[in-house]
């Protein structure tokens, strides 16, 4: 399509500009190459060298230090992905748009897409051939309506786009929570219990995106979590389980691309959520999967009908891919555990595993319940014996021992476990009983205080729903490291502390986010 | 929402990076401000100073020359729009997303939007508060379905978002072609005829975006077209008409924003087209509007049914806004006139106005027909007398004289009128009759040769549909200035010259684009 013009050869320069996910390149307004594209203002271009092709969005510069007349500046992700040294001559032409964009436009017009079309879209997404705008076009085009077949095709294509793990065991279990509840670090209790029993549970987790901590952030307080595929296999082989960051093993990279656009647009459809979660779990090679859907007024799912529709979608996709999927709804009215933020949550987890008398009972009970479900997948275990077995492994210290083994296998953490040196307490305005806790508000407050960037920032809860409080008694304590974060969190908490006591206070509202 | 942190004050730096329409800012990865946003990778931020607010997309840099630790680098559009000197301290916080985005999400979920919601969206668009992704979300959310009321609200809001011209005359006429046909510079013949008659016709035109020339590009060969509002009024007052670039008078700026995203996504819906054209015409203050819809196998509209649906939409919107709208379909099977490219088209126009014996008859006839329709809007003119009056004004030289007056009023052109010094001819492969011409292919060929950047690049046609040709006789000549463009155009023409002769050649296909 585009025979090379002699002057479309440009020298690679590196531009230290982090453009997130999108490939962005810069050429000089004086450049002899791509005159029409410079004139038009916006365009996509194509870099080619030895069969390697990179599609990128073109920006124009008048600054020679970004790109001189004979140069093309590659921003960080483009430079990393094209992987050629500075100064290399590269052919630059107007981009031939990925063919799969035709299917995206058909979807926008309302047509149902074939498996092959969806496969092509996902393949192009996973290879960073779409601009952010084009990703948005696909997401929004499929946000209003996708068929069951499209959902299956999407999930399958996403699962195949990256690393696909294969395990030698007939039963490989996994658990996943759809998120939204502060604390709630059940995986870090469940994995050692299940692994101590002997079932393989190769757990990958995410880092916090909009919450004050993801499981990977919290585990990082105790051990290294940036673990690659081969190392992961070795750890699971020796310990039956792991607790690592999923981003390092490249499961479902197309999902990461989609999320990078869903998030800024606050798009959140059931189908995308199911395709996202199931594609990662299928790629991770688990055969039996437990999905936890917390339900509560400030949780992601606020009612039983919504939870059931989501459950059926998970079951449908699981069945079609030959995975055993069990979906349970749990109490999502308030945080699980007493800590919010990586260090505080890690403390909760170790207290539960260590059978400390002050360990949060809700985290212990929920973890035992989830572990019980997973243990029942062991054909050798007598039906109904899962809970007793889980409790036995926890109470005996076997789970704690297994956790130490996993921590040793993953390697030492490099994070400080210190709590923020600045703190303030939020106190009850009057006597009464705690009647509601706003999960969204506490999440936001913990982030404002510095979590998860500051591992030791966050919130320690003293009271939960149903607890009696007296006027002036602390409801929770906020930890921060720097005065500005401390002050910002204090003023945010003063504007609304997220607790309703006895009906004297208004119920926290979902719109408070 | 975001009380200022002391360290969220950053010094403005100018980053000479042209990011097109979108506001983009850069901060250092070492910056103490916006730590959470740096960590998340993608976010929107807000710059505030003395009540002025700018929303922008945040990029991160490791290069101190783009932004040091205490600086924020503003890319070109952001720097221009914020309009504060380098070094100014500005408060930078995470952005509060525009409230109207909630309506965009509702639209994506399938809800119909109110007039107020659409008004808020358009207002935010026109003030550059949306990211490119957010604009795409709105466009695609409304691409699948918008109601008549939504279309009216959209058109009205867009018309009100920028300059709104008001004329003292009871009848102000205008014409608009939906485009797609090479050559076809009827406005430059129609405006002088109508103006010579005495009807006001304040014509604004676009520059080429994806075509080899817009009316503004072609007029620029003859006169200055970057004319502001006040000057435009003076010109229309003295000459009854003008032929200027619409981009300089800021009619419907929201439309320009939408087009900047529609174009790279190749989104093209009837409703958006109607809202786009009608909003500009309503803002331009015309009372009587003639819309030209060329129909042909390689035109934008390929059949009568499609043309009729579009016509009804134009009529509907025109009626509701109290404008007289007349829609005519014209022959869109081939280029109008013999030239493609600014200089070649300007030559055609001046030949028609000058009544040269070699002037292209099709351009003359189509222009007379359109002018006739417009002249009939003059209440003083006898019904049915429009065509004769138009011909009289053209044949007598009155139209040419009026054109000279308009050119003098707008001021001299600074462009060269020379044709490209390199050229090649495309010749008939055998004897026969020209049976089809591919408009898309010729448009692309003229662009490849350098138009509209090189005003004198383009194509001169020797044969049109129905003409007899002999083997080896030239069909057209391609002009370019530089060898690379010449060679590229030659190889493109060799791969398919866009002409079908006698049925010996395959009919050009629409997919050839």
UniProtKB/Swiss-Prot annotation, chains A, B:
Catalysed conversion reaction: thymidine + phosphate = 2-deoxy-alpha-D-ribose 1-phosphate + thymine
Keywords from the named record: Glycosyltransferase, Transferase
SMART domains the UniProt entry points to: PYNP_C (SM00941)
Entry's Gene Ontology molecular function annotations: 1,4-alpha-oligoglucan phosphorylase activity; thymidine phosphorylase activity
Coiled coil regions, renumbered to chain: none
Disulfide bond entries: none
Enzyme class, UniProt record, top EC level: transferase
A GO-annotated cellular component: cytosol
InterPro entries on file: Glycosyl_Trfase_fam3 (IPR000312), Glycosyl_Trfase_fam3_N_dom (IPR017459), Glycosyl_Trfase_fam3_N_dom_sf (IPR036320), Nuc_phospho_transferase (IPR035902), PYNP-like_C_sf (IPR036566), PYNP_C (IPR013102), Pyrmidine_PPase_CS (IPR017872), Thym_Pase_Put (IPR028579)
EC number: 2.4.2.4
GO biological process: pyrimidine nucleobase metabolic process; pyrimidine nucleoside metabolic process
PROSITE patterns: THYMID_PHOSPHORYLASE
KW Glycosyltransferase (keyword) present: yes
Protein family according to the UniProt entry: Belongs to the thymidine/pyrimidine-nucleoside phosphorylase family. Type 2 subfamily.
Record protein name field: Putative thymidine phosphorylase
Organism: Bradyrhizobium diazoefficiens (strain JCM 10833 / BCRC 13528 / IAM 13628 / NBRC 14792 / USDA 110)
């Amino acid at each position: 399509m585009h025979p090379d013009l002699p002057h479309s050869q440009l020298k690679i320069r590196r531009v230290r500009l982090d453009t997130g996910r999108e490939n962005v390149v810069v050429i000089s307004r004086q450049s002899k190459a791509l005159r029409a594209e410079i004139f038009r203002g916006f365009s996509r271009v194509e870099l080619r060298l030895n069969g390697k092709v990179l599609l990128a969005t073109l920006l124009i510069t008048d600054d020679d230090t970004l790109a001189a007349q004979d140069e093309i500046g590659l921003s960080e992700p483009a430079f990393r992905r094209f992987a050629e040294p500075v100064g290399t001559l590269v052919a630059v032409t107007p981009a031939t748009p990925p063919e799969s964009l035709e299917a995206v436009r058909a979807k926008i017009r309302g047509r149902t897409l074939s498996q092959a079309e969806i496969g092509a879209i996902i393949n192009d997404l996973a290879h960073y051939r779409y601009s952010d705008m084009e990703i948005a076009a696909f997401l929004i085009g499929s946000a209003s309506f996708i068929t069951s077949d499209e959902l299956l095709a999407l999930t399958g294509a996403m699962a195949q786009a990256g690393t696909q793990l294969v395990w030698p065991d007939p039963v490989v279990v996994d658990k996943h929570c759809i998120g939204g509840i502060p604390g709630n670090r059940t995986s870090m209790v469940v994995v050692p219990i299940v692994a101590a029993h002997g079932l393989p549970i190769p757990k990958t987790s995410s880092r916090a995106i909009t919450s004050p901590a993801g499981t990977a952030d919290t585990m990082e307080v105790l051990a290294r979590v940036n673990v690659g595929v081969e190392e992961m296999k070795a750890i699971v082989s020796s310990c039956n389980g792991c607790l690592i960051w999923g981003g390092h093993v490249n499961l479902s990279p197309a999902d990461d691309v989609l999320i990078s656009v869903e998030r800024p647009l606050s798009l959140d459809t059931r189908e995308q959520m199911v395709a996202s979660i199931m594609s990662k779990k299928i790629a991770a090679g688990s055969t039996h999967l437990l999905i936890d859907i917390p339900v509560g007024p400030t949780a992601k799912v606020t009612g039983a009908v919504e939870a059931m529709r989501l459950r059926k979608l998970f079951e449908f996709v699981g069945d079609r891919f030959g995975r055993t999927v069990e979906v349970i709804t749990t109490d999502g009215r308030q945080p699980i555990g007493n800590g919010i933020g990586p260090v505080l949550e890690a403390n909760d987890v170790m207290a539960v595993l260590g059978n400390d008398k002050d360990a949060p009972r809700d985290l212990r009970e929920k973890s035992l319940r989830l572990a019980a479900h997973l243990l029942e997948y062991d054909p050798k275990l007598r039906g109904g014996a899962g809970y007793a077995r889980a409790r036995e492994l926890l109470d005996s210290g076997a789970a704690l021992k297994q956790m130490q083994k996993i921590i040793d296998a993953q390697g030492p953490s490099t994070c400080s476990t210190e709590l923020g040196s600045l703190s303030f307490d939020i106190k009850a305005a009057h006597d009464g009983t705690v009647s509601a806790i706003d999960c969204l508000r506490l999440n936001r407050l913990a982030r404002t205080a510095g979590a998860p960037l500051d591992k030791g920032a966050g919130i320690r809860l003293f009271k939960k729903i149903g607890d009696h409080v007296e006027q002036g008694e602390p409801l929770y304590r906020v930890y921060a490291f720097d005065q500005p974060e401390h002050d910002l969190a204090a003023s945010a908490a003063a504007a609304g502390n997220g607790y309703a006591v006895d009906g004297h206070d208004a119920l926290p509202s979902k719109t408070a986010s």
